[in-house]
Amino acid sequence: CFLKTYRAVIAGGPDEQLPPEGILRDYLFKDSRKGRVFPVKRPRKGVREAVLEYRIVETAPDGSLSLAEITLHTGRTHQIRVQFASRKHPLYGDGKYGSRFKGDIALQSARLRFVHPDTGKPMAFSLPLPAAAPWKEFLE
């Protein structure tokens, strides 16, 4: 079993479109000519289902940003970016998908767990939150 958990800083806080935790399920269409991925209403040729589970860990005091933990159930191109942006919560720094914040895209692989293929030993790796903006907003 291979488990990878991501962290992202997203615009805004929990609301009707994005409760404090949940599962996001969408159909995504990858337009290679435009270099973008779009959510669509129904399956059709070239469309793939995208599923992720998330939890809002903390929201900044002014409500402008939130820290989210994300586990992918599928691994689609730009999946995390598109699924949050389609709910009006783009990732910090992600101008391609609607962020008004300038900077690097605030998406990080936070934890990785798997069973070593030779020894069978459980392996686990994790990264701390970066000390740079916008992550430092959520450091204790």
Predicted segment positions?
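RNA pseudouridine synthases
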Residues: 1-140
